[in-house]
Amino acid sequence: MYSLRNKVQLIGNLGKIPDVKKTETGKKLVKFSVATNEFYTNNKGEKVKETQWHNLVAWGKLADVAEKFLNKGSEVAVEGKLVTKEYTDKDGNKRSATEVQINELLLLGGKAGD
């Protein structure tokens, strides 16, 4: 029998310096965003670059690695799962946010534009 999994794999570049936080219980987490680019040719024959931004979060030892080694422009490969959280904003509106909770992180060494 086959089972489907919630699995995401991305290769891209960090948009800014990672944001290091601690929970009320003292657990460290690091949040950062990664841009992925896709290229295609439109119906006019022009090459088009389409950028998607993905919000990621690392916990535990991966948070330590992210804090120590990641910087704006760092090229990374990540694997994780999609997690959607619901919250109430400052105006009392219910909102949801989806992020990738990573369980693997590879530093690829390139910078944006390489």
Residue spans for each PLM region:
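Single-stranded nucleic acid-binding surfaces, predominantly the OB-fold ssDNA-binding core
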Residues: 1-114
